[in-house]
Design a protein with these regions (language model features):
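Short catalytic/ligand-binding loop motif for oxyanion handling, primarily in non-cytosolic enzymes
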Residues: 9-11, 31-34, 124-128, 173-177, ...
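Active-site-proximal beta-strand elements of phosphoester/diester hydrolases
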Residues: 1-6, 112-136
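Structured beta-strand-rich core segments of catalytic domains in phosphoester-bond hydrolases
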Residues: 28-124
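Short proline/glycine-enriched turn/loop segments at secondary-structure junctions
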Residues: 54, 234-237, 264-269
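Low-complexity, intrinsically disordered Gly/Pro/Thr-rich segments
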Residues: 255-266
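Metal-dependent phosphoesterases centered on the DNase I-like endonuclease/exonuclease/phosphatase
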Residues: 41-42, 136-247
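Conserved beta strand-loop-helix elements of the APE1-like EEP
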Residues: 57-80, 105, 213-256, 280-281
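Active-site beta-strand/loop signature of hydrolases that rely on acidic residues for catalysis
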Residues: 2-5, 14-36, 116, 149-178, ...
Length: 282
């Protein structure tokens, strides 16, 4: 599953109650003491960008790959700076607080191992020289850094040569029309285009399943299949409008992967983002 937990404690407690094997988290801090022994967040250098960046005050929440069951083994990739050659257990990272990666080895020997990537496209503020009116900035820059980093696991134009599952909060609105006031549609489209060029298929989540916002939110086409995965402080799960969370998988491997937004009001969870349930069948 994938979930932006907004640096909150209660989502951790909800995680341990689920029958999940692994969680791809975004904006996570350390788990609360009362459940820390029930989750395995792996070595700190797989998620904490301070391991390779000396500016200790830059960030306080992270993407993580968290082991939740003994049905799998997890081999976490250590973050290193943006270098061209890495070790077998390393991933070169170009953004702070944007990515965590690991290899998942199911104990069920019928399911081949695969790589998971937790993605968080942080907002970036334009340079002061732009005199921008954008209040929060842009997220596509972080998304492209993530794509550059995960592309290290791709060494062929044939997508059958890799098994990658990437999911998380990209802070973009899929399929937004050019009049959408909350998006940069032309720039955002380059994210899915580039994923597709790498052989990573878009999985959604899309309706059906998942609850759609009604009426259709401003800035989306009438036939949108988007499902809201995020609500603002002025909204609730019942009034959530926009989908910011997405999943991708290597083409071919994607046929074994299903995704669903757990966005019904009674299953949303204790974050401003809902959970995205991801099931790998083989």
């Amino acid at each position: 599953m994938s979930w932006n937990i907004a640096k909150r404690d209660e989502p951790w407690r909800e995680l341990v109650k689920m029958d999940a094997d692994v969680a791809l988290l975004q904006e996570a801090c350390s788990p609360p003491d009362d459940i820390a022994s029930h989750v395995d967040t792996g070595p700190r250098d797989h998620w904490d960008s301070h391991a390779w960046n000396s500016a200790k005050g830059l960030y306080d929440r992270w993407p993580m790959v968290v082991k939740l069951s003994d049905r799998i083994e997890v081999e976490w990739f250590k973050q290193v700076g943006p270098i061209s050659d890495t070790g077998e257990d390393e991933i070169a990272v170009s953004g702070i607080g944007t990515i965590a990666a690991a290899r998942i080895i199911p104990r069920d020997t019928t399911t081949p191992r695969f790589i998971v990537v937790s993605m968080y496209a942080r907002w970036i503020r334009p340079h002061l020289s732009t005199s921008t009116k954008w209040r929060v900035g842009y997220a596509d820059g972080s998304a492209h850094r993530i794509i550059s980093d995960l592309s290290a696991f791709i060494g062929s134009t044939d997508p059958e040569t890799h098994r990658i599952l990437a999911a998380g909060d990209l802070n973009t609105i899929y399929g937004a029309t050019d009049d959408n006031p909350l998006a940069l549609p032309a720039r955002d489209r380059t994210i899915t285009d580039r994923m597709d060029a790498l052989g990573l298929a878009f999985l959604g989540p899309q309706h059906p399943p998942g609850r759609q916002a009604r009426p259709v939110p401003q800035g989306l086409p009438p036939d949108t299949r988007n499902v809201p995965t995020y609500h603002t402080t002025r909204q609730s799960p019942a009034t959530a409008q926009n989908q910011l969370d997405f999943a991708f998988a290597s083409r071919g491997f994607d046929r074994s992967v299903s995704v669903r937004a757990m966005n019904a009001v009674d299953e949303w969870g204790a974050s401003d983002h809902c959970r995205v349930l991801i099931e790998v069948a083989g």
